[in-house]
C-alpha cells in the first residue's frame, strides 16, 4: 500500500522526491522546543468568558455577604430536617394503620395522581392567574367557580383543594389567607360535591335535626379548612 500511494503524491508535487524527506531521527527532541506564548489570550476577540450554568448552586463574588448566605443555607437545612422528621412520623403512622386503612390510602393516592393529570390544565390556569402581580381573593374565587361550573366531576374539586393549599403559601397576609380558605371552601362544597359525599356516605341516624345536605356541606367545608390548616399554621408561625 505504501509503495502504491507514493508515486501518486510525487506526481502531484506533494512529495518531490523520497530522498528529500529528512530522516525522522534528525528532528529535534520535543523537550528542546521553547515555550510558546499563547498570543490568542492577548487578543480581544478571544477574551470570551464562559457563563456560569444557570443551575449553579454556589455563586460567590466580591459583593456576596457570606454570613447572609450561610444564614439562608441554614434556613434551607432546617426546613429539610423538619420535612424529613415529618415524613418519618407519617411513615411510622402508616405502618401502624390497619391493612384495610392502608389499602384505602393506596387507592386515594392512585386516584389523586389521576386527578392531577386529568385536571392539570385547569390547575395551570389558576396558577397562572395567581402568579400575576395583582389579584384579589374574589378574582380567584370567581375563576375557581367558573371552572367548577364547567366540570361537574369530583376530581377537579379535589384538585382545587390542592390548589388552595399551594396558593396559601404565596399569600403573605394571614387575614387574606383565612378569607381565601373560607371563601374557596364554600365554593368547592357545591351541590355536586355534596352529591358525591351523599353517595359514598352510609346512612347515619345521628345527624342533627337539620337537613342532611346542609350538614354534609358543613362537614365538607370543615374538612377542606382542616386540610389547609397546616399551610396556614406554617405561614403564621
Swiss-Prot record:
Q: Name one GO biological process term.
A: regulation of apoptotic process
GO CC, any one term: host cell mitochondrial outer membrane
UniProt cross-references to InterPro entries, sorted A to Z: Bcl-2-like_sf, Orthopox_F1, Poxvirus_F1/C10
> Which Gene3D superfamilies does the entry link to?
Blc2-like
Keywords for this entry?
Early protein, Host cytoplasm, Host membrane, Host mitochondrion, Host mitochondrion outer membrane, Host-virus interaction, Inhibition of host apoptosis by viral BCL2-like protein, Membrane, Modulation of host cell apoptosis by virus
Which coarse location class describes where this protein primarily resides?
Answer: host cell
Q: Source organism's superkingdom?
A: Viruses
Q: What does this protein do?
A: Plays a role in the inhibition of host apoptosis. Interacts with host BAX and thereby inhibits its activity.
Name of the protein in its database record: Apoptosis regulator OPG045
Q: Which organism is it from?
A: Variola virus
Amino acid at each position: 500500500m505504501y509503495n502504491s500511494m507514493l508515486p501518486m503524491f510525487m506526481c502531484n508535487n506533494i512529495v518531490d522526491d523520497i530522498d528529500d524527506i529528512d530522516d525522522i531521527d534528525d528532528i529535534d527532541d520535543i523537550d528542546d522546543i521553547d515555550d510558546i506564548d499563547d498570543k490568542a489570550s492577548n487578543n480581544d476577540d478571544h477574551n470570551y468568558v464562559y457563563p456560569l450554568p444557570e443551575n449553579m448552586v454556589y455563586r460567590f463574588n466580591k459583593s456576596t455577604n457570606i454570613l447572609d448566605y450561610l444564614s439562608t443555607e441554614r434556613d434551607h437545612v432546617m426546613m429539610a430536617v423538619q420535612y424529613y422528621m415529618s415524613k418519618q412520623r407519617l411513615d411510622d403512622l402508616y405502618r401502624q394503620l390497619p391493612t384495610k386503612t392502608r389499602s384505602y390510602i393506596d387507592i386515594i393516592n392512585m386516584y389523586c395522581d389521576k386527578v392531577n393529570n386529568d385536571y392539570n390544565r385547569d390547575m395551570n390556569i389558576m396558577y397562572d392567574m395567581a402568579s400575576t402581580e395583582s389579584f384579589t381573593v374574589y378574582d380567584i374565587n370567581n375563576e375557581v367557580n367558573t371552572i367548577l361550573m364547567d366540570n361537574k366531576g369530583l376530581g377537579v374539586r379535589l384538585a382545587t383543594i390542592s390548589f388552595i393549599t399551594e396558593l396559601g403559601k404565596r399569600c403573605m397576609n394571614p387575614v387574606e389567607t383565612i378569607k381565601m380558605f373560607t371563601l374557596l371552601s364554600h365554593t368547592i362544597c357545591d351541590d355536586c360535591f355534596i352529591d358525591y359525599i351523599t353517595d359514598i356516605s352510609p346512612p347515619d341516624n345521628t345527624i342533627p335535626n337539620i337537613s342532611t345536605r346542609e350538614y354534609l356541606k358543613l362537614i365538607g367545608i370543615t374538612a377542606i379548612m382542616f386540610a389547609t390548616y397546616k399551610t396556614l399554621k406554617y405561614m403564621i408561625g
